[in-house]
Amino acid sequence: MAENNIQLNEQEEKKSLNFVQQIVADDLAAGKNGGRLSTRFPPEPNGYLHIGHAKAFCMDFGVAEMFGGTCNLRFDDTNPAKEDTEYEQAIMRDIKWLGYDWGDRLYYASDYFQQLYDFAIRLIKEGKAYVDDQTSEQIAAQKGTPTTPGQESTFRNRSVEENLDLFTRMNAGEFPEGSHVLRAKIDMASDNMHFRDPIIYRIILSPHWRTGDKWKVYPMYDFAHGQSDYFEGVTHSICTLEFVPHRPLYEKFVKELAGDKVDEYCPRQIEFNRLNLTYTVMSKRKLLQLVKEGLVNGWDDPRMPTLCGLRRRGFTPESIKNFINNIGYTKFEALNDISLLEHSIREDLNKKANRVCAVLNPVKVVITNYPEDKVEMMEMDNNPEQENAGTHQMPFCREIFIERDDFMEDAPKKFFRMTPGKEVRLKGAYIIMCTGCTKDADGNITEIQCTYDPDTLSGMEGANRKVKGTLHWVSARHCKDAEVRVYDRLFAVENPSADTEHDFRDLLNPESLKVIENAKIEPFLAENAKEGDKFQFQRIGYFCVDQDSTAEKLVFNRTIGLKDSWSKQNKK
């Protein structure tokens, strides 16, 4: 047995391994593939990565990192009609954002088109593949069912010479798309439907974004994938559970390709459960539909489960990776509660985000006994969770804004915010008491009058007296306007994919986006916020600066509220 030079570091040894990591550890201990470990992440460049893909590549890169191996990034670019460099660049950006790097190990399935074509020619010459002229519908009809065998194609017994001639002409562009396919000749009575003479090549006349017009025939996933793994020296091909029935075909083609060298090196396919999340969809087709029909504002809409959407919303790489680690990898499909992801970002931003004051639905408060021209600078903690986070200054004056919901003229007994005749504390400032309010002709409150106690400034002895309510606020004279986009869950139902009675688009949450045009923010925030920065708006939630921000007006996206409001609704 080859000596295994790849060892777990001491920290990892102390952790319990998931089943994929255990398989890898056992293979390395047994000296398989010369004690090497090489994984790969093989996305198709035909869309943006979502959090489900992140679970996959966190495993691919993570297990390689854990055991001192390597992980390749290989684009499965076998369908030129749907692929684009835009997606390629976005995929690479998202992987790097989560903290992974493939180094010089960037590959494409198209790197192996000649080798795959040569392998197909070899199979034809050995009588193991044939050209079929039937339509895809006819071929599907002949496949049979899991309990009844399929029917052999009338073209199954063509001569090697005829098959070689037709396949060569297919690649020369002599035939239209859909007119001919190359099928592996295996067993139309096999219990495994994937063994019933699977299609391994089809005609696509669209130019390829890397190879141009060189090829007119392109390999199917089952034919390209395992062989690409073999060409690259991949030892562990990790994928999701829907590929379990494909594994025997993966192994068959690899063994055909490797021949008598299969005992020296052979990649192994391992499957784990995919990530399914409540209140969203993971289907690339459905997500594309939402984008194309304008039901969301692009792939990076902060309501989308795409990594670029989560990034724009304010999710951090650490929160996503922690969530993925917490839900784990198993062999059983499950629907994961989105509240676990939301908890992960709350936990992360609680440690990292500076606290600031912003008033989303403002009403003016006039402190009638405070000098009109006086301005005091109040010292506000940036983040009490961090010892060295420091403080910032916030101006206080006679007129301030508070949240309209923080005032009630006729309040019930357990209302501890502002109401006439009761005291409340202004965060970092004074204790004030409401003395009255002004209304317009429709009965809407336009102004609240209060008095303050000058001996209750935060830090003074008078500030210690018991007051139940504490409100956030901003100076009316010094605050700036900002746009705030309050995002919520994309769908109104827990599992939109399971609802067979409704079109999934009819299940969208109509309250998933509310735009507040003129929220009031404190000067410190207005002067220091940069695109992507994350803050806690005190008593409201976590927000980040959006890319639509301008020098004149900042735009903030709500990442998540301070508390899970959905759990309360669901308990009702």
Protein language model regions, located:
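Long, charged, mostly alpha-helical binding arms that flank functional sites
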Residues: 264-344
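Core subunits and conserved enzymes of cellular information-processing
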Residues: 243, 247, 251-253, 318-321, ...
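N-terminal Rossmann-like or analogous alpha/beta NTP/dinucleotide-binding catalytic cores
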Residues: 2-152, 215, 242-269, 274-276, ...
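Intrinsically disordered or highly flexible coil/loop and linker segments, enriched in small
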Residues: 33, 100, 129, 176, ...
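Glycine- and acidic
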Residues: 38-46, 71-78, 230-238, 301-307, ...
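Active-site cores that bind ATP or allylic diphosphates and position pyrophosphate for catalysis
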Residues: 77-79, 85, 122-287, 345, ...
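Residues forming anionic-ligand binding surfaces in small-molecule and nucleic-acid pockets
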Residues: 63-70, 226-232, 295, 302
